[in-house]
């Protein structure tokens, strides 16, 4: 045996002793790596096998999961029973799950929130009707089949397809067939199964005294809600096309769209004739375009709803009413007792004027009090007299306004807004206005006060330059048109409100004035607008009046406005309105321009509310007479008579009305009554202390366009 050879026992001993230990460890490590690779490969293969096939169609998301899948948060399908329930053996109990209600749906029944619209849809009205029919019918009498809740959206024939009776008079200028579009309150329902269609069988005789089939129905049928939102036929909404998962959401969306699109389709007629009213016995009447505005609701033609359309309110059986379409028109409304009822939003009145106090709206408690007018139209829609005498139910009526009694002459516009765009040919010369304002301020105010006003105007001068440097002549003309159009709109508000109001340009020139402001200050409208000469000598001095002896602060009245010419168009005279600075005392003028500098290009919706002192309009003759009366009062000669004489002078300044001194009432302290009392404010010192609020309105170029000011005297 070779010395290098070993026996098997020796090899085993060497292995035990560790001589071959490194080779064994390397072998074990190699096996572990191979096993790890195999496990990773198996996992990768399993993951690839479990991955979705990219070529298979994408699963469509289910609109609503079933109850079992909803509880288990599993993916469900639209079919019922779903595949998961079939695999688990729950196919008999597979039904749609109920979602968590939103806050605005807490009062809605669960049946309404179920997906889909079918014949078994929950309906309060039909549920109550079925209960009543089931209790009132005997087992031996066959019951009439009730129509399902799902109504077809097929449009019914138009109104003009109904035949007319020859004994009914009809004016060709009125009626829905002459409208360009359908009324917004016009849900078209199909005629019921039990009602004959007059279009399909026009030759069938129809009695004028025939009442709808719902006339003999039990009152319990009409105890449900007046507006049933669960009816899918409401205004013929196609809920399937709206692709809503929620039934209530689809109805809400459809109703909003109906109101938004239906309001603009109202026929162009008098606003009073379009108002829907609830006439006698709850009949919904809608005046036609040709109806007289003074026509009472009982004489107006029922346009859409008949008496059966209001049974939810009156709780009485309907009464037949002959309409413009003859007796056959009752067939349309005869089957509407089990249909939803709704009204569209009507348009607002065309003017802001209110009727007289004796023509105010009232709640008429007796339908017999409706006044019949001789010019109510060529047709009549009065109910049967024998039936109307049996029941006199309280009804709600629209205001019975007579057209001839509407006193709107003082507030009615005499011109059209389009005339503004035709009359404005040249831009307004704001440069001349600012030059005139600067000259007036230098003449009236002291150098210190003039400097404060100049600093305020200088702070906004760069903004004016920056906003107007890119404007050409056409832009300036357009700016003046915008100003005149806005001023035209403000005239109604000034006349409607009783607050002393003035509107002036950004230069401070008066552009509009209310009657109350003239009564308060004595400044006539023609003088403020520059149409008549300004002879005011009151500049708010210590005595309130300026005499010839005063040197500083005196102001020479401007000549007649026709002598002042526009620098841009010297051929035509330029009227010079009164400046706002002429209406306020010195401190109020300075405070106004300092506030104007902050608000002109600041907050576009901001306003300033503070106090001021308005200057009364005083001429030199008034100052001489008042100075003489004051001298007599100081001398102790008939002071009371001089005070009465001063009050007498006050009665003839704003409106030109004179007051007799003997019949003049002596007002007590704090007493104000009528125009005379308003004129008496501030007459002694020529100043009226007021609280006023003003704001700046800008034009389309973001430039201050006009200033609106409201005054209230401090009494």
UniProtKB/Swiss-Prot annotation:
Q: What highest taxon heads this organism's lineage?
A: Eukaryota
Instruction: Give the Low complexity compositional bias ranges.
Output: 386-400, 650-662
Claim: Membrane is one of the keywords in the record? no
Q: Which residues bind DNA?
A: 66-94
Kindly list any coiled-coil regions of this protein: none
Q: Where is this region: Disordered?
A: 1-28, 129-223, 354-414, 534-569, 628-663
Q: Where in the cell is it found?
A: Nucleus
* UniProt keyword terms in alphabetical order: Activator, DNA-binding, Gluconeogenesis, Metal-binding, Nucleus, Transcription, Transcription regulation, Zinc
Q: Name one GO molecular function term.
A: RNA polymerase II transcription regulatory region sequence-specific DNA binding
Q: Name one GO cellular component term.
A: nucleus
Question: Where do Polar residues bias regions lie?
Answer: 1-14, 129-166, 179-191, 203-223, 362-385, 535-554, 639-649
The family annotation for this protein states:
Belongs to the ERT1/acuK family.
Instruction: Supply the PANTHER family for this chain.
Output: TRANSCRIPTION ACTIVATOR OF GLUCONEOGENESIS ERT1, ZN(II)2CYS6 TRANSCRIPTION FACTOR (EUROFUNG)-RELATED
- What is the official name of this protein in its record? Transcription activator of gluconeogenesis MGYG_02011
State the organism of origin.
Arthroderma gypseum (strain ATCC MYA-4604 / CBS 118893) (Microsporum gypseum)
